[in-house]
Amino acid sequence: VLLVPLLAGCATAFTNLTPQIQERNAAGQYPVETAMDCSRQALRWDSIQPKIIVGNQAYPMSPTPLMTNRWEGFVPVPPGTTTVRYHYKFDFEYNAFGKPKPDSTVSPEYTLRIKGQ
């Protein structure tokens, strides 16, 4: 777990729940999952828009069923590629004087290795 400070003073911890190595599959789509904890009480949890970032491409994530702070999505890995580097970006709003304000946080970079043919 790595703590990443946000611009507005929130301590955020990402926990990557994705196996580092996955078997190659015919669909070329690989599941990734993360948990995010934030100490900021003013965070508007219903405003979170998480993404998986691979290079300059962003892939959407969905809330993990029955969990309050976990999200999951899929990373495409083309045939012949054995390593993908990715990170998570969470855009959200927090309550402030007046109206809610936007903010975001980014996880450390992770590596997914694909084995098999």
Give the location of each predicted region.
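Sec-dependent bacterial lipoprotein signal peptides
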Residues: 1-10
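Glycan-association/targeting regions that enable binding to alpha-glucans and other polysaccharides
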Residues: 10-117
